[in-house]
A protein has these predicted regions:
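Short, low-complexity intrinsically disordered segments
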Residues: 4, 44-45, 134
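Short secondary-structure capping micro-motifs at structural edges
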Residues: 17-21, 33-40, 119-120
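Short, extreme N-terminal segment that most often corresponds to the first beta-strand
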Residues: 8, 52, 130-138
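Short N-terminal helix-initiation segments at or just after the protein's N-terminus
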Residues: 1, 69-74, 127-136
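N-terminal low-complexity, Pro/Thr/Ser-rich intrinsically disordered segments
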Residues: 1-27
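Short, exposed beta-strand-loop hairpins at the edges of beta-sheets
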Residues: 114-128, 134-135
Length: 138
């Protein structure tokens, strides 16, 4: 378990059943690790980040088109351990603002995964079979 911002613990989970209760999780996802946390020390806004494994032939169907070049900033308190550590290896990724990462690349929408209240976010293809998705409320 990692220590998140504002003294909260962040655990990485691989419970797909629990993840399905929070977001739309396509049947093509074979495994996932995920974590959640607050966006600020006060208020009710929060985020969910997930690294998902998908068969290579099914991954393109999960990427909302079109991709736009951009930079994804990991949410405050997200712990870059377990499968999340692979974000550090994305070309151009760099640490910013303490525990956060800035990760450049083609960013996709999160329409295939969005479920109220998690309606904002980005998806980033990490490899031929791996996808990083971050969603947040607001």
């Amino acid at each position: 378990m990692g220590q998140a911002a504002w003294g909260r613990d962040v655990a990485v989970s691989n419970d797909i059943v629990a993840l399905r209760r929070l977001i739309n999780l396509p049947a093509d996802v074979t495994s996932a690790q995920w974590q959640t946390g607050p966006l600020a020390p006060h208020g009710g806004d929060w985020w969910l980040a997930a690294v998902m494994d998908v068969p290579a032939d099914r991954l393109p169907a999960l990427l909302a088109d079109p991709a736009a070049p951009g930079t994804l900033t990991t949410p405050p308190g997200m712990v870059a351990n377990a499968s999340f550590a692979a974000l550090k290896s994305v070309p151009g990724a760099r640490p910013i603002a303490g525990d956060r990462l800035s990760v450049p690349g083609p960013l996709h929408g999160i329409e295939p995964f969005a479920r109220s209240p998690l309606l904002q976010g980005h998806a980033l293809q990490m490899s031929a079979t791996r996808l990083f998705v971050v969603l947040w409320t607001m």
